[in-house]
């Protein structure tokens, strides 16, 4: 009896040690999940129809314009032509990538690759790795590179949240690679990240923190993802430089200093 108890104890101890070393959370790839007839499937189909109803050339217009190319259609209105131009294009890449992973729909696949090819054309036209739709982008980023920074909550050098805006492009390219397996998106993402390293390499940490007073979305997360994708630690350093100490340092100390902060900062 004692021998049996001893062996059982060893088995339980080994099982516990294995459980403690195992990942605490595991994810199902979207490709492995299929929805049955349900409100969830109805919602997915509604989303699918909306995604395909959008005109890709209108979403691409700001990116082509800023690259000095002729848009194939006028851009959308409201936020897409009043200063936040191009931000929906980044969201659109993410939506297409996830929808393709979830459904395998060929129309979604073709739409995603049309977007990526056109954006790549714009990226090549600029020649620095940059892709973006903020009006006056090239002048803006040259000012930032020169250390001329005028930052406020929704403003950076007179432009409407350009960091937040370009984060959507970064995230969209990342998702096109991770969810849809696009090697083109991976290279475009790396080139765009290398461009940001060039823009910010001459800025001090103080200048970086000053710039981050402007709404900047989750750029640090995306740069950390690029480090994971490539295995190159220079992108992890970029992620560190884009981490806003005003918000994060108090949290590290278990202090709540979030009152009055804008959620899209992080």
Label each residue range with its predicted role.
Residues 1-21:
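Bacterial Sec-dependent N-terminal signal peptides
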Residues 20-266:
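Glycan-recognition and catalytic cores of secretory/periplasmic carbohydrate-active enzymes
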């Amino acid at each position: 009896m004692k021998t049996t108890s001893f062996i059982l104890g060893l088995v339980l101890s080994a099982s516990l040690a294995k459980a403690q070393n195992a990942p605490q959370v595991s994810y199902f790839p979207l490709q492995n999940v299929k929805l049955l007839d349900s409100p969830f499937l109805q919602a997915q189909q509604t989303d699918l129809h909306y995604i395909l109803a959008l005109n890709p050339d209108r979403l691409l217009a700001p990116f082509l314009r800023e690259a000095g190319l002729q848009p194939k259609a006028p851009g959308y209105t409201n936020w897409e032509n009043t200063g936040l131009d191009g931000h929906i294009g980044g969201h659109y890449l993410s939506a297409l990538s996830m929808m393709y992973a979830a459904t395998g729909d060929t129309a979604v696949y073709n739409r995603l690759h049309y977007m990526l090819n056109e954006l790549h054309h714009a990226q090549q036209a600029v020649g620095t790795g940059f892709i973006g739709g903020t009006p006056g982008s090239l002048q803006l980023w040259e000012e930032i590179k020169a250390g001329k920074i005028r930052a406020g909550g929704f403003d950076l050098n007179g432009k409407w949240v350009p960091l937040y805006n370009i984060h959507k492009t970064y995230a969209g390219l990342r998702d096109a690679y991770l969810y849809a397996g696009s090697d083109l998106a991976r290279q475009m993402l790396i080139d765009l990240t290398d461009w940001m390293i060039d823009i910010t390499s001459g800025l001090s940490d103080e200048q970086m923190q000053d710039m981050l007073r402007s709404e900047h979305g989750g750029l640090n997360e995306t740069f950390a993802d690029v480090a994971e994708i490539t295995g190159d630690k220079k992108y992890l350093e970029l992620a560190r430089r884009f981490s806003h100490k005003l918000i994060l340092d108090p949290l590290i100390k278990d202090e709540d200093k979030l009152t009055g902060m804008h959620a899209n900062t992080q």
